[in-house]
């Protein structure tokens, strides 16, 4: 997600916070001018020094609603910074990360690295088999088991597995009023 300077970052703060609460992985990038027209042959415009600069940089605007903040200071560190922010966004618990990338860096010429490192797929967190067995035993012993949902709908596979489990054992489902996702079909018998 590319947002405009501090102003766009603040306008996007509610969406970023929602992603943080819901555990939605994303990389958010914005930045500001670092040279304010003093860099030869690069004039970002007068609006930067007058209206768009944030004292101390933009990272502190969102550091409480993202997992990680950093500054990509040049085109030489940009690729690896984006990869790292993406990896961190996808690691458990998932959520948004933020990179401050200056206008000068965004506008600079970039050559991809000759040998970019292979980016591994995001790790998946799986429940230990012994925990699944414990849960199955608890459900089997319960006289009137009920499933309470909150965040199962984030992944299609989890959603479908929950429906199949509840169908197989005729388990009633209650969705928490503040559920983060659609966790169970509303029209399910």
Spans of features found by a protein language model:
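N-terminal alpha/beta PP-like core and its mobile active-site loop of ThDP/TPP-dependent enzymes
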Residues: 1-189
